[in-house]
């Protein structure tokens, strides 16, 4: 599989790049216009459904498009020749973009979704544990704590994936 991808890297890289551009543009348009209030009439894109779910789907499509763009850019520059300084700088820039998206944008958008439309705050109770588990004390977990646990899982999972990928690349 890897040999096939390497042999056809330009044939695969360019369409992947343009598919990513289309997904990014389409996702941003849907995410932007889905965020408007229900009764507000907007230009040409009034047909886009409103609410947090279409907005989140648009953000997911845009994020997926950004990943396709980066994959396409890597495939187009991938070669079996010795690595030059300029190509190393190019790959390090793409790596920096990827890490910025994963560790900056993705957790931020998750927190915006959880704190905004979903209203996962510390005042809302997610689960109340049985008192017999905690020596008769009442212990509960709020949606705010659940939101932070999910964000921590996203960041830590990505960090572990970066470590494993860095080990495998060497």
Map each language-model feature to its residues:
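Short hydrophobic alpha-helical membrane-anchoring segments
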Residues: 28, 32, 71, 75, ...
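Cytoplasmic juxtamembrane interface segments
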Residues: 69-103
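Transmembrane alpha-helices of multi-pass eukaryotic membrane proteins
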Residues: 9-17, 59, 86-92, 151-155
């Amino acid at each position: 599989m890897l040999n096939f991808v390497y042999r056809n890297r330009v044939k695969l890289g360019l369409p992947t790049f343009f598919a990513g551009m289309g997904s990014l543009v389409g996702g941003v348009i849907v995410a932007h216009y889905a965020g408007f209030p229900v009764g507000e009439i907007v230009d040409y894109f009034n047909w886009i459904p409103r609410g947090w779910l279409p907005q989140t789907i648009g953000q997911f499509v845009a994020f997926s498009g950004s990943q396709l763009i980066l994959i396409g850019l890597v495939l187009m520059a991938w070669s079996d020749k010795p690595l030059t300084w300029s190509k190393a700088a190019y790959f390090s820039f793409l790596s920096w973009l990827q890490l910025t998206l994963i560790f900056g944008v993705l957790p931020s958008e998750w927190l915006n979704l959880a704190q905004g439309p979903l209203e996962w705050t510390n005042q809302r109770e997610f689960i109340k544990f049985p008192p017999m588990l905690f020596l008769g004390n009442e212990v509960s977990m709020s949606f705010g704590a659940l939101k932070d646990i999910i964000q921590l899982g996203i960041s830590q999972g990505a960090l572990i994936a970066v470590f494993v990928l860095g080990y495998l690349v060497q």
